[in-house]
Amino acid sequence: MANDNIPDAPDDDDLEQLVGEWLTIPDLGERLGLRLSDVRQLLVDRQLLGARVGPRNVMSVPSKFVDEAGPLPGLPGTFTVLGDSRMSDPEILRWLFTPDATLPVAGAPIDALLAGFKTEVRRRAMEAAF
């Protein structure tokens, strides 16, 4: 489903390049010290979002979504707000990784989340719903 609230959204083929660094499910499990089933459960519970990328179409998660402690705490609520606006998972990923010069930090909404601007990102996510 296309969403006109995503500025200059790239095609699905460009999602892999837009996000940049991805972690496969096994790599993510190793990084977090979790079993593969536990990593998959994070996706089912929408603590993380992923996409099939690469030449082998492997389910992967953007590396910016996790730190040493696990999934970034601001992500699930942001996923919910964007999902409530009827964005698909690929559209949510595009929105989070598309650069926005009007943010309080340089980069994309994911960079603003990483810098601690969760409220600002969620406000913009709510605006994208309308």
Please annotate each region the language model reported.
Residues 1-130:
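Non-transmembrane "mature" sequence context
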